[in-house]
Amino acid sequence: SYMVTLKTPSGEQKVEVSPDSYILDAAEEAGVDLPYSCRAGSCSSCAGKVESGTVDQSDQSFLDDDQMDSGFVLTCVAYATSDCTIVTHQEENLY
């Protein structure tokens, strides 16, 4: 599994995420309260920004290439592919 550091407005949380778990799901199981809405990768409620490390969010359908290249990630459909650090609650910074 990978160690994902979530930088939330209420502080930093470290969550262990297995390769087959979405980051949002693993965070919830660990008791970390992250925003979400559709849980299907088709809105921006759960958006975060990857500061370091890598993720696979091929299931998402909302972000464009520029947003993904900038590091934005939809945590509800993102798998960690390495240890990574993600800033959460980034929806308002997408636009």
From Swiss-Prot:
Any one GO molecular-function label of the UniProt entry: metal ion binding
UniProt cofactor(s): [2Fe-2S] cluster
Gene3D superfamilies: 3.10.20.30
Keywords assigned by UniProt, alphabetized: 2Fe-2S, Chloroplast, Electron transport, Iron, Iron-sulfur, Metal-binding, Plastid, Transport
Positions with a binding annotation for [2Fe-2S] cluster: 38, 43, 46, 76
One GO cellular component term: chloroplast
GO biological process: one example: electron transport chain
Domain 2Fe-2S ferredoxin-type residues, every copy: 2-92
Keyword Transferase appears in the UniProt entry: no
This protein's record includes keyword Nucleus: no
InterPro entries in alphabetical order: 2Fe-2S_ferredoxin-like_sf, 2Fe-2S_ferredoxin-type, 2Fe2S_fd_BS, Beta-grasp_dom_sf, Fd_pln
Entry's localization field: Plastid, Chloroplast
Signal peptide: none
Cofactor binding: number and manner: Binds 1 [2Fe-2S] cluster.
Domain of life: Eukaryota
Pfam families the UniProt entry points to: Fer2
Principal subcellular localization: plastid
UniProt family annotation: Belongs to the 2Fe2S plant-type ferredoxin family.
PANTHER family, alphabetized: FERREDOXIN, FERREDOXIN-2, CHLOROPLASTIC
Functional description taken from the UniProt entry: Ferredoxins are iron-sulfur proteins that transfer electrons in a wide variety of metabolic reactions.
Full protein name: Ferredoxin-1
